[in-house]
Design a protein with these regions (language model features):
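Phosphate-binding glycine-rich loops and their immediate beta-loop-alpha structural context
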Residues: 102
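Flexible, Lys/Arg-rich cytosolic regulatory linkers and terminal tails that connect or flank
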Residues: 1-41
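Cytosolic Rossmann-like ligand/nucleotide-binding regulatory domains
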Residues: 35-97
Length: 102
């Protein structure tokens, strides 16, 4: 039901205000989150915080520079992480990122 999908999506994003929806594309979503100082995921590598199936780190902005995230890149406070997730993993991905980085 399309109305349920819209309602579920609105609820998800309202419950996670520190996570910004950048784009919805057919079958997936691109969003970003700014890493809080003291968050669980700080000082961990992308490999260590890649715990959700069907989610991919696509960019990290740090101090005005763009980083293409490989497994060895270490997450730092104030990094802005951009993620792509398949539609069916959107809720899981947003919750996971909020838990790690907020």
């Amino acid at each position: 039901n399309p109305d349920e999908i819209v309602a579920r999506s609105l609820f998800l994003w309202s419950e996670n205000p520190d996570t910004q929806l950048l784009a919805s594309i057919e079958g997936g979503t691109i969003f970003e989150i700014t890493v809080a100082d003291g968050a669980k995921g700080v000082n961990k590598t992308v490999r260590e915080v890649s715990g959700v199936k069907d989610m991919l780190y696509i960019a990290i902005r740090r101090g005005g520079k763009l980083i293409i995230p490989t497994g060895d890149v270490v997450i730092m406070p104030d990094d802005v992480i951009t993620v792509f997730t398949k539609e069916e993993a959107e809720g899981r991905s947003v919750e996971y990122m909020d838990e790690l980085f907020r």
